[in-house]
């Protein structure tokens, strides 16, 4: 029997927007416990997004949330070993995991970009995700295509 699951920790909302989602994103962005630096990077990235997309009617937080929703995957493939063969079985993703995957993908592909500061890279990735482009969006589409290709094995889900 497995151990009991640990309790979920309460995540405090951030000071500027009052959003727990922002705090989760910043926690993923943070290195070495430097949360204030991560918040500064995030807020300056949102300011740069606001400058780049000045013709949009939405606020910078709404643009970021829309970009995050654009790169949120719906299905993923998991390896299942059945009868000596390994199958890529498409499975739906739980809502919390969807959010975590999209945040981590956005940060990962922002870090891989060329640019001077992390705020520049993150703002460029947010703009690309908002426009359904960029590395994080491509990753989501690749996951969807792989699940689509392997949907014949969906009955192996347990």
UniProtKB/Swiss-Prot annotation:
Keywords: Ribonucleoprotein, Ribosomal protein, RNA-binding, rRNA-binding, tRNA-binding. GO terms for cellular component: small ribosomal subunit. GO terms for molecular function: rRNA binding; structural constituent of ribosome; tRNA binding. CDD domains: uS7_Bacteria (cd14869). One of its GO terms (biological process) is translation. One of the primary rRNA binding proteins, it binds directly to 16S rRNA where it nucleates assembly of the head domain of the 30S subunit. Is located at the subunit interface close to the decoding center, probably blocks exit of the E-site tRNA. NCBIfam families: rpsG_bact. Part of the 30S ribosomal subunit. Contacts proteins S9 and S11. Belongs to the universal ribosomal protein uS7 family. This is Small ribosomal subunit protein uS7. It comes from Azobacteroides pseudotrichonymphae genomovar. CFP2. The lineage of its organism: Bacteria, Pseudomonadati, Bacteroidota, Bacteroidia, Bacteroidales. The gene is rpsG.
